[in-house]
Amino acid sequence: KPLFNYVRNATVKNLKIQGTNIDGYGLVNCYTVDYGDDGDYWGTGVPETISIENCHILSGTNIKYSGFLGGYASGLNVVRFSNCTVAQNVTIGYGMADMMPDGLTHSTGALAGDFNGYVTNCSSAATVMGQDKVGGLIGAKGQSMGPCEIVDSQFTGTVVSNGCAGGVVGSGYSSGNSPCVTIEKCTVSG
């Protein structure tokens, strides 16, 4: 199971994750919105859901779903990844045939499945597998209003999918008011 079941307005840093078969997500099962001081998650003073800094998934680890994060927040409540790595000989998504309770497939990525937020200076050399929306770093943009920006990051592993797939992000989010996914100064090889 993940190290944390639920987080809100959290910072996790300087952590190494290793496990033969982690039955779930690698770090956090669920993270949630925080409606801030005024009760409105659109206003100022809305904290980030989680910041993950200098965390690493070590070689030999197998994770059933996405690497670090499970269920996502929404809107402007973002996640930040910085200086995180997923080593070679790591398998993300070994439960790719499994369905969620509502019958939908999981979005799968070495860092996160469904994601709103910022990734800076992260890398993965993992094998990432899933049914649909599978990305080397991020499975899919999670919600229409939140940002999804990946900068100065790289993927050198393998992506296996029966549907939408990408070396950095597996799928965007289609909506008239949705900001685009931003990918800058990233490399993919493998």
Task: For each feature predicted by the language model, list its residue ranges.
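Surface-exposed loop/turn motifs in large extracellular/passenger domains
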Residues: P2-G190
